[in-house]
């Protein structure tokens, strides 16, 4: 089985072809990604209209390249999948419309994929992990701990009550005068700084419910920065290091609470999976490795290029759904908000 996946929910335009081999293993045949960082850098963040226009300009070319790299023709595909949300509605419509047109033209099944579900299932493509497992989803727009029990079967254990982790990184970077995107810049500066200089709060620490709250931490960084007259590079590095240390401690504490709740509500946990762009942060990956080793839990960290948005994860989620006979019709609309919960109506779309 071979599926084309299209991703346009934010500021990456992506197309990929993934193959399901005999025995159930997935194989990435092509994975084309075009970032829009340069287009948005001057604004310090993603501008929805610019993002949508950029998707329109490059998507057809990326799809053609993905098919060429995979050495496959459109007619040889078994299905065409596209991220239908959550995300910026203009961009989602671009990818969704393109996928529907290709599916109609080639008489292939169309699969509407939840972008968050695609992140959740990536570890099954890279590592073949069995259900159930604990997902830590950390990106610019989402921070959640989710019990992944099956395709379309998710239990959200905890989430952020305000800022997502990636959003906090970007906002701290902006207030400290660092370049966009902020996550890699904060990590780069943190490597040079003293993580103990500033005693920033660890929000929600010790609470039984594994929710996150980062607005207070973000405010603490702003206050500390404002108290320093003309911060030097050393000051900025120390602020970044102290902020990142607080984030790491918070994520470990919240993950511990999430694992405890998983075992109470679901049972044995086969692994902890990290997904989303923030999962590429080296300090976070090292801390989670230690946490899982101490907890006797297998940790799955997909390659950094599969943590950020990509078409391969959409194609794989399409394969997972198509394997169960779940396809969608051409009336499926973009869903800028689309929760990843087992009791949400949107989690059970598709018809067998």
From Swiss-Prot:
Coiled coil regions, renumbered to chain: none
Keywords, in A-Z order: Acyltransferase, Cytoplasm, Iron, Metal-binding, Transferase, tRNA processing
Cofactor remark: Binds 1 Fe(2+) ion per subunit.
Chain residues that bind substrate: 137-141, 170, 183, 281
HAMAP family, alphabetized: TsaD (MF_01445)
Biological role: Required for the formation of a threonylcarbamoyl group on adenosine at position 37 (t(6)A37) in tRNAs that read codons beginning with adenine. Is involved in the transfer of the threonylcarbamoyl moiety of threonylcarbamoyl-AMP (TC-AMP) to the N6 group of A37, together with TsaE and TsaB. TsaD likely plays a direct catalytic role in this reaction.
Protein's UniProt name: tRNA N6-adenosine threonylcarbamoyltransferase
Species, as recorded: Methylocella silvestris (strain DSM 15510 / CIP 108128 / LMG 27833 / NCIMB 13906 / BL2)
